[in-house]
Amino acid sequence: MSTFGENITIADLERDPYPIYATLREYEPVSWVPSVNCWLVTRAKDVEIVTTKTELFTAQAPDSPVDRSFGGPTLMTMDGKEHLELRRALDAKFRPRIVASYIDELVRPIALEWLDRLLTQESRTAELITEYFEPISVLSLGSILGIGNLTAERLQDWFHGLAMGATNFEGDPAKAAENDRVAADIEFELRPRMQRMQDSPDNSTISSLLNHGCPVGQGRTIDYVLPSIKVI
């Protein structure tokens, strides 16, 4: 007799995953799902155990589309010392107390600008996710990363292309091609910037990931850091 998890399809998850998660939480809180080649853990207490007992559970997922999409191991798929070192490199910008000190000044002007754009549209209608919330999100994060000069349209294109690749469990060639197009554009834009940051560090998050905790002139390589930048 097959389990509920064995009968879950990618199409089911893409259509509406939340009823599926609810069923798993009630009947199969730890379930092997062949369609995505991984275990789904859906109860909060179990999730806490999996994410904190690093001596028992690994974040590495070499057979998932995640590492392929982002171009290598990332913060999400690293364990131990590697993960800790990159996390520490992010602390200067992303500790809750630090975020609280700058988030309003950073986000409010962006939110107001994009609200004004919506209000000047003749139709007075909008798709709020793509035309308001996503631009605010990507532009705010882009500023923190050190790429605040890039347009919302380009950053949204990166976001959607990488997400498409990271969830391409079915190995769809069209999704892989779209991911690769976006990855190439990111490489084209970021690699020269990162080379400059290696020579002349600044206070951006990207620079911190390259240089934090490293001896002068011996920072992390671009190839090592870039996958985690894509995740962020």
Segments from the language model and where they lie:
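Short alpha-helical scaffolding segments that buttress acidic/His motifs in well-ordered protein cores
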Residues: 90, 159-162, 209, 228-232
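Generic alpha-helical segment signature
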Residues: 14, 83, 104, 183, ...
